[in-house]
């Protein structure tokens, strides 16, 4: 990036879909890592995956079109669908099933208004990884509905503890109806660079290009040069980060299982736990204030334990809270200790 700045060659507007050499590198990444064969013209560089999702929804949705969303989901999915005049249709899942919907649930959610389905793997907020077997089951359902577009958010691809990431578009006869999204925030810790990309069937990619051309235009030229270097450098840093996250996950999992009243599963990717905490609803703190929701519990823990958690309501799971383990081992151990102490103070009778 510094070299690009010093050269003075990248101060003009880049092409709307991104520099050709960058899109070529993304195409090679898709081919080598994901078994996807998107041409350069089927790739659009964006200002991050949220921008990609926005481009996609505004490009494919007409007013009243439905988009199936696996819940829990990343909070922006439902908001962006609604902004684009679409209707989110939620498929609710349970922690006992690792937050994976059954193919029967998927089939029951489909109507004649269904335009697309969106999910992330690994998933934020649950850490769920959809295996090839899982995706094959969903494919069985979707083969009976050829007009439905699949939107696969793979931003956490390299924080996958199963070591078997599967892109939905790599399944037989699925690439021609799958939009694959990825970026640099997680694998390369480049959150501030705002750099994402889409691989999409050509006609959809053309529509996305038009949409982006009339809104943000191209992504920052210098960010693209940094992204190109990151792709060329390979995944060694991502593998190192994944190993660290795996150690932290195991530490937090053991600590959370020591806390009475919390129901927790073992996430297979990303860097979040999403425990079920509804057993604390109806309990009271030492001031007699009753806990009635995940939001109430999160506020209580912020005040009493000085631990920041995200309530599950906006993720489509009102009985859960999200805990990130993107912190040091010392901080995580201390946080779990505080959570245990503060939750232990809650009583059902206010005593």
Language model region names:
Residues 1-48, 55, 231-233, 345-351:
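N-terminal small-domain helix-loop-helix segment of the aminotransferase-like
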Residues 59-81:
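Conserved PLP-anchoring active-site segment centered on the Schiff-base-forming lysine
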Residues 65, 86, 144-149, 175-176:
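A short helix->loop->beta-strand "cap" motif at the edges of active sites that frequently abuts
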Residues 83-89:
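A short helix-loop-beta submotif of the ANL/AMP-binding
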Residues 93-163:
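Active-site phosphate-binding strand-loop segment of PLP-dependent enzymes
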Residues 107-108, 284-292, 296-351:
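PLP-dependent enzyme catalytic core of the Aspartate aminotransferase-like
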Residues 171, 176-246, 250-259, 341-343:
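Conserved core segment of the aminotransferase class I/II
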Residues 228, 243-256, 264-283, 319:
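Conserved glycine-rich beta-strand-loop-beta hairpin in the small C-terminal domain of fold type I
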């Amino acid at each position: 990036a510094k070299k690009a700045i010093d050269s003075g060659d990248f101060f003009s507007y880049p092409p709307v879909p991104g520099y050709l050499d960058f899109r070529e590198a993304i195409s090679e990444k898709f081919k080598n890592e994901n078994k996807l064969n998107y041409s350069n013209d089927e790739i659009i560089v964006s200002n991050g995956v949220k921008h990609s999702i926005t481009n996609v929804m505004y490009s494919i949705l007409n007013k009243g079109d439905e988009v199936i969303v696996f819940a829990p989901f990343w909070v922006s999915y439902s908001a962006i669908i609604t902004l684009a005049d679409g209707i989110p249709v939620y498929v609710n899942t349970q922690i006992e099933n690792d937050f994976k919907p059954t193919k029967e649930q998927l089939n029951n959610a489909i109507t004649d208004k269904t335009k697309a389905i969106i999910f992330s793997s690994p998933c934020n907020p649950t850490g769920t990884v959809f295996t090839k077997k899982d995706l094959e089951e969903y494919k069985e359902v979707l083969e009976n509905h050829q007009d439905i577009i699949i939107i696969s958010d793979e931003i956490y691809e390299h924080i996958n503890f199963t070591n078997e990431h599967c892109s939905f578009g790599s399944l037989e006869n699925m690439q021609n109806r799958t939009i694959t999204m990825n970026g640099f925030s997680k694998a390369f810790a480049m959150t501030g660079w705002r750099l994402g990309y889409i691989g999409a069937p050509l006609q959809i990619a053309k529509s996305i290009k038009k949409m982006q051309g009339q809104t943000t235009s191209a992504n920052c030229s210098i960010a693209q040069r940094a992204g190109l270097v990151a792709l060329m450098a390979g995944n060694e840093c991502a593998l190192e980060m994944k190993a660290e996250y795996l150690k932290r996950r195991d530490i937090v999992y053991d600590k959370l299982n020591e806390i009475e009243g919390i129901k927790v599963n073992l996430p297979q990717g990303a860097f979040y736990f999403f425990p079920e905490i509804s057993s604390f609803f109806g309990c009271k703190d030492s001031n007699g204030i009753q806990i009635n929701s995940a939001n109430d519990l999160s506020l209580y823990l912020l005040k009493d334990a000085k631990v920041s958690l995200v309530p599950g309501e906006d993720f489509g799971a009102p009985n859960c809270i999200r805990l990130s383990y993107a912190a040091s081992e010392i901080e995580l151990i201390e946080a779990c200790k505080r959570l245990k102490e503060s939750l232990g103070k809650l009583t059902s009778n206010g005593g």
